[in-house]
Regions:
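Cationic, low-complexity basic patches in intrinsically disordered or flexible, solvent-exposed regions
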Residues: 9
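Short, Lys/Arg-enriched N-terminal segments with co-localized hydrophobic residues
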Residues: 15-24
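Conserved protein kinase catalytic-loop anchor
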Residues: 217
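Catalytic cores of alpha/beta
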Residues: 288-292
Length: 293
């Protein structure tokens, strides 16, 4: 891993100084804020290559301001092979080349703030891309220090360890011949699930979140955040037909046993130190389950 950036190495939570003007959450500005979602790829193309980009968004800030919006929520702009519209992230601290550069992002952030607009980013931390440096290392061997960053299990005769079906298609387990093991992916096989049971993974994520907040972003929309804690028994799911021949993993992954513990830790280590907004995507949550968040 020599020569790779800090994001790709285990690290403790970054105890950074609050930037000038940033304070611990003391207001409820977000309660009355009007949020406008931007899908960068189709919003505005600034250079004529047929793909929307960050500079295109910057060029339309005055227009967005006239709409009366307060917050711009950006769908993922991180580096990604784009197997799932950017929700498969290969580097949390880099911008997808289709959209521009980090300098372009910083200019967008600065110009938005000048106009009284806030920027909220998608936060995708249930899984990464299989092209992320962590996963490339994880699959090399069972003794690799990154092995436990993901959820690996052995089945019998190279078969999946249980009958869970992916929310996209097929089995939720992908066989990897290198170590004769399967890794879990609730979504595409290109999106291996992170192992939130591993405190090193959580430290990596909190450090990354702090890095973006130190840049001045105004919060996160947390993608499928209710899925980060899995039932560690990994029992078979009920076969209902919804996943074909496979079982339903939903009862063992949604609103899992440690999800609130993890989010409370995230709040202590990162979120409570900034005047920001957060929104959590919690698929299929009941009113009672939602209230716990």
């Amino acid at each position: 891993m020599k020569g790779q950036n800090k994001e790709k190495r285990p690290a403790g939570v970054h105890k950074a100084r609050l930037p000038e003007g940033r304070r611990i959450m003391s207001t409820n500005w977000w309660k009355k804020a009007v949020v406008y979602q931007i899908y960068p790829r189709s919003f505005c193309d600034s250079n004529g290559d047929g793909i929307g980009d960050l500079n295109g968004i910057t060029g339309r800030l005055d227009y967005l301001k006239t709409l009366g919006v307060d917050v711009l929520w950006l769908s993922p702009v991180y580096q990604s092979p784009n197997a799932d519209n950017g929700y498969d992230i290969s580097d949390y601290r880099a911008i997808m080349k289709d959209f521009g550069t980090m300098e372009d992002f910083e200019r967008l952030l600065c110009e938005a703030h000048k106009r009284g607009l806030r920027i909220v980013m998608d936060l995708v931390v249930n899984h990464t891309s299989d092209e992320h440096a962590w996963f490339r290392e994880s699959r090399k061997s069972e003794n690799n220090p990154y092995r436990d960053y993901y959820i690996w299990k052995k089945g019998k005769d190279s078969k999946p360890p249980n009958n869970w079906g992916s929310w996209f298609y097929g089995s939720a387990w992908e066989y990897d011949q290198q170590t004769d093991s399967h890794y879990l992916h609730i979504f595409s096989k290109k999106q291996p699930d992170l192992n939130w049971e591993n405190p090193k993974v959580r430290r990596e994520i909190y450090d990354m979140m702090t890095w973006w907040l130190e840049k001045g972003v105004d919060g996160f929309r947390m993608d499928v955040i209710s899925l980060i804690s899995k039932n560690q028994r990994f029992p078979d799911g009920q076969v209902t037909g919804a996943y074909g021949e496979y079982g339903d993993l939903t009862p063992y992954c949604e609103n899992g046993p440690r999800v609130h513990e993890y989010l409370q830790e995230m709040n202590r280590e990162v979120l409570s130190r900034y005047d920001i907004m957060t929104v959590g995507e919690t698929p299929n949550a009941t009113v009672e389950a939602a209230a716990r968040y």
